[in-house]
Curated annotation (Swiss-Prot):
CDD domains: ABC1_ADCK3-like (cd05121). Residues 1-18 have a biased composition (Polar residues). Residues 1-23 are annotated as: Disordered. InterPro entries: ABC1_dom, Kinase-like_dom_sf, Prot_kinase_dom, UbiB_kinase. It comes from Synechocystis sp. (strain ATCC 27184 / PCC 6803 / Kazusa). SUPFAM superfamilies: Protein kinase-like (PK-like). This is Uncharacterized protein sll1770. One of its GO terms (molecular function) is protein kinase activity. Belongs to the protein kinase superfamily. ADCK protein kinase family.
Length: 585
């Protein structure tokens, strides 16, 4: 089996995305147990469950104030979470492809995890060794049914990039076209099958957990992860996504998308047009090529708004490794179409209803649209959720436009979601993640870049076209819209009254009249009375132990002193309960 090495251009974004130590075909020498052909399934279970149970112990420890040296503070909790987040990221890397991808998916789920974990998971990049050229060639020949020499005029044995799911080689077809060949990692589907079976048990454990299962659909999250992971192993699907993406930008000369060579593509092999470019985060190279960084930042934002608003089909992983710029014309080049998002027309309409609610600062409309989207679970009392949304609106809308940040908005939204029954669909989190990542890329190119400022004209145009909001202040249109809204509310009122009465009949709604302040004071007085009893009991035992000790009854004194620890511990528990009650009111 022969192969001809080809000299790689320095502007190739695939090679630039690799750390220096990985720009050669690193052999998988058993550094990771999952990478061995004969790894033990039992050992795999031990590795995964060991990680999960250790993580749960750390979560439990976070809530224990005695575990903080020098006393608990919010700052110490954040510092501990940051350390834990790094530990989580390192362990996900060592657990291999399945958990690297799960970690990357969880980096979009700030509604599930604290901000410190999500921030660290967003840095999670594939750091696994490349597999050998012999393995890659064997997979290509088995999938395409021909020897390497008959398929390609030349094939570089040194991968341009290696990741958890596969690696990319440069090659040249016999017809003269330069291509990149993406080869799936050997044994990947077997590993996914084992890992996902274990993850199913973990999801069930979390679902039944008294704290972590409350208000969370872990089984649904597991199913979502399964779907996305298996989709990423199908390179035919990725090829179709690349084709659709290329078609959507066909009339735009400022974006380039690689062409798929279907004759050289299968479920485990993807052959794409070779489009070299300057990595979008290599600022010195961009300036040396005479490209304007500020314009590139605007171009990236424009490309994503075009994807989302014009076609509803968008690239869900726009990190700098997947974006490059052609040095000649400054065109934006997209790579890697394994993770794509799609918004259906119905979802788009519901999202627009949310946007209208934001424009009107109408928390009621936003909450109703989020319920319709399936992003919010309807509860008996939606009042706290409406107040949380209204608080976010008041803080967001009252700021000058240039101070608004898509990252800050999504962080605030996720902070509310973390304590409320939100369950953001994957598409929503992909959109927020893509926009947040893109804002980071834009600020790297231009420190003054503001994604919201770029998005404003697009949003206003769509709202005008939808007749949902008229910033120009056309009074008659606005009155007509308000009349329709009032009419809809009036028509829906009998149904809402009937629903409320039905819920009263079923006992789902309980009406209770009480004095909250009086109840609180009575509870506090009862607790303090009990605390006084514990203090007296403890003091009596300590005094008894002291008298016994003075009279040389050392053993009896030790026993009585140990007995005094029981009411002392009960007193400590009582004081903690009082502290919690004070925080609640």
């Amino acid at each position: 089996m022969s192969a001809l090495s080809t000299k790689l251009e320095p502007t190739n974004s695939y090679s630039e995305s690799l750390p220096p130590q990985r720009r050669s075909p690193l052999e998988a020498e058993g550094r990771y147990r999952w990478n061995r052909g004969n790894y033990s399934i039992t050992r795999r279970r031990i590795d995964i469950w060991g990680f999960v149970l250790t993580l749960l112990y750390q979560f439990w420890l976070n809530g224990k104030k005695w575990s903080y040296a020098g006393g608990y503070t919010e700052e110490k909790l954040q510092q501990r979470r940051r350390r834990q987040a790094k530990w989580i990221r390192e362990n996900l890397l060592s657990l291999g492809p399945t958990f690297i991808k799960v970690g990357q998916l969880f980096s979009t789920r700030s509604d599930l995890f604290p901000a410190e974990y999500v921030e660290e998971l967003s840095k999670l990049q594939d750091e696994v060794p490349a597999f050998s050229y012999e393995q890659a060639a064997g997979i290509i020949e088995e999938e395409l049914g021909k020897p390497i020499a008959k398929l390609y005029r030349s094939f570089d044995p040194v991968p341009l990039a290696a990741a958890s799911l596969g690696q990319v080689h440069k090659a040249q077809l016999h017809t003269g076209e330069d291509v990149v060949v993406k080869v799936q990692r050997p044994g990947l589907k077997k590993l996914f099958t084992i890992d996902l079976a274990i993850l199913k048990k973990i999801a069930q454990y979390f679902q039944n957990h008294p704290k972590w299962g409350r208000g969370r659909d872990w089984n649904g999250i597991y199913e979502e992860c399964c779907k996305i992971l298996w989709q990423e192993t199908d390179y035919l699907r990725e090829g179709r996504s690349a084709d659709t993406f290329r078609r959507n930008f066909r009339g735009e000369d400022w974006v380039k998308v690689p062409r798929v060579y279907w004759r050289y593509t299968s479920t485990q092999i993807l052959t794409l047009e070779y489009l070299p470019g300057i990595k979008i985060s290599h600022y010195d190279a961009l300036e040396a090529a005479g490209l304007e960084r500020k314009e590139l930042a605007q171009l990236g934002a424009r490309a994503y708004l075009f994807q989302l608003l014009n076609h509803g089909f968008f690239h869900a992983d726009p990190h700098p490794g997947n974006l490059a710029v052609s040095p000649e014309a400054g065109e934006l080049i997209f790579y890697d179409f394994g993770m794509m998002g799609e918004i259906t027309p119905d979802t788009k309409n519901k999202l627009m209803d949310t946007l209208f609610g934001v424009a009107e600062k109408n928390a009621e409309r936003i909450v109703n649209s989020l319920v319709a989207l399936g992003a919010l679970k309807e509860t008996e009392d939606m009042g706290p959720i409406r107040r949380s949304v209204q608080f976010l609106l008041d803080n967001f809308m009252d700021k000058p436009f240039e101070e608004q940040s898509i990252t800050k908005i999504s962080d605030d939204l996720y902070e509310i979601a973390y304590d409320q029954p939100f369950r953001f669909p994957a598409t929503f989190t992909f959109v927020m993640r893509a926009f947040s990542t893109l804002e980071g890329v834009g600020k790297g190119l231009d420190p003054d870049f503001n994604f919201m400022a770029v998005a404003q004209p697009f949003a206003l145009q769509i709202m005008n076209n939808s007749n949902g909001f008229n910033p120009a202040g056309n009074i008659m249109d606005e009155l007509g819209r308000q009349a329709v809204q009032v009419g809809n509310s009036a028509l829906g009122l009998p149904r809402r009254i009937e629903d409320s009465l039905d819920r009263l009949d079923r006992g789902d709604i309980r009406v209770r009249v009480r004095s909250t302040e009086t109840d609180r004071l009575l509870r506090r007085m009862g607790t303090m009375q009990m605390g006084t009893n514990y203090v007296l009991f403890t003091c009596a035992l300590v005094l008894s132990a002291t008298l016994l000790f003075v009279n040389n009854y050392f053993m009896a004194a030790a026993v009585v002193l140990l007995m005094s620890l029981v009411p002392a511990f009960a007193l400590w528990r009582l004081l903690k309960r009082l502290e919690r009650q004070d925080r609640m009111f």
